[in-house]
């Protein structure tokens, strides 16, 4: 079969049409970080060695502390806490929700969907489902939710939640200090097409690099066994250098941001806030340099949250909306990149 365009999605230019789910509104946000902050010194002590220092971790990742979920707490527990806070902020009852999307790489089980447990915990009765696109999960979920709203299913609860600390080897000095736990939530509702709310979303997937950063075991390709556990194959593995992952992440986010700006007709200087996934501070700084945008327009949360994977974007949104840094009329670009490779960007105007 001959196809009109065999180029990967990351190489395709703007579609030239209006975003089909344009105008969806964020009605409320919420977030939850479990337990007490875990300092760099505590991470080093947990690793049981002297392969790194607190100063090295902060200098290379930007992280001073992060949160790790206590034993007995599952991803759905974190998600439910964030959900209740977002529902309260939105003034929406759980019983009025039209759909729940739980975006996560660390669902409670392989089956059923952990979103079903969230539904039960918050007292909802609507359809609920999981979405897994690594660190880009929540942005993919936001696009899905906006399309649900556009077709009459609203409001939609979009959750990003992960307990990634349990999927990193204890002695992995590169990743153990970085990955953390948390949950963020947004209640999304339908809005008018009046140049406010969600204006467009760009999503990118590049399966040719799927094995660069992945968890080898636990799925259908390599089911759990005594050997996979003994070999540590249920932990995150980096098959390429951190430098290469950084370069690819910057390429995905910068390209997606430029596409979105072109689609909505904004100059980069017209954006008030860039809310980005924060895998580490070096990637974020590299992105600001690539785009020529001062770091003051990029809210930084990784210093006290670590990399919360799918929770990063909604947690950062919740923080800046609650502390007053974001106000009516502000133009926001959201962007992310993660394993898969997957990523993208979105343009949002805070409704007046």
Locations of the language-model features?
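Condensing-enzyme catalytic core mediating Claisen C-C bond formation in acyl metabolism
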Residues: 2-71, 172-247, 251, 255, ...
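Short beta-strand segments
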Residues: 27-30, 103, 132, 156-162, ...
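Short acidic, glycine/serine/threonine-rich loops at helix termini
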Residues: 37-38, 111-113, 168-172, 343-347
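Acidic-glycine-rich active-site phosphate/pyrophosphate-binding loop
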Residues: 50-58, 109-123, 158-164, 224-230, ...
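Claisen-condensing/thiolase-fold acyl-transfer catalytic domains that form or cleave C-C bonds
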Residues: 76, 80-83, 87, 106-107, ...
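Short glycine-rich phosphate-binding loop at a beta-alpha junction
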Residues: 95-103, 268-277
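Flexible, glycine-rich active-site loops centered on histidine and acidic residues
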Residues: 146, 152-183
């Amino acid at each position: 079969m001959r196809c009109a365009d065999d180029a990967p999605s990351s190489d395709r230019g703007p579609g030239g049409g209006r975003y089909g789910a344009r105008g969806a509104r964020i009605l409320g946000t919420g977030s939850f970080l479990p337990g007490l902050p875990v300092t760099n010194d505590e991470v080093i002590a947990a690793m049981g060695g002297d392969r790194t220092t607190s100063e090295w971790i902060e200098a290379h990742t930007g992280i001073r502390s992060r949160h790790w979920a206590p034993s007995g707490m599952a991803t759905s527990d974190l998600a439910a806490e964030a959900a209740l806070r977002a529902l309260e902020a939105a003034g929406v009852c759980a019983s009025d929700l039209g759909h729940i999307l739980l975006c996560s790489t660390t669902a409670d089980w392989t089956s059923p969907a952990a979103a079903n447990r969230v539904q039960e915990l918050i007292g909802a009765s609507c359809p609920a489902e999981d979405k897994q696109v690594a660190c880009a999960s929540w942005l993919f979920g936001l696009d899905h939710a906006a399309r649900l709203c556009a077709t009459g299913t609203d409001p939609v609860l979009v959750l990003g939640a992960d307990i990634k600390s349990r999927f990193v080897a204890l002695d992995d000095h590169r990743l153990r200090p970085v990955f953390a736990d948390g949950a963020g939530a947004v209640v999304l509702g339908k809005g008018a097409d009046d140049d406010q709310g969600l204006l467009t979303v760009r999503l990118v997937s590049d399966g040719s690099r799927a094995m660069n950063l992945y968890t080898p075991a636990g799925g259908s390709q390599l089911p759990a066994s005594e050997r996979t556990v003994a070999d540590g194959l249920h932990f995150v593995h980096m098959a390429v250098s951190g430098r290469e992952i950084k370069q690819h992440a910057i390429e995905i986010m910068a390209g997606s941001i430029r596409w979105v700006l072109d689609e909505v007709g904004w100059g980069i200087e017209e954006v008030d806030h860039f809310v980005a996934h924060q895998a580490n501070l070096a990637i974020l700084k590299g992105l600001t340099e690539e785009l020529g945008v001062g770091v003051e327009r990029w809210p930084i949360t990784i210093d006290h949250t670590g990399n919360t994977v799918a929770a990063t974007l909604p947690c950062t949104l919740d923080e800046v909306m609650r502390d007053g840094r974001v106000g009516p009329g502000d133009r926001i670009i959201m962007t992310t990149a993660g394993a898969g490779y997957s990523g993208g960007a979105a343009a949002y105007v805070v409704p007046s």
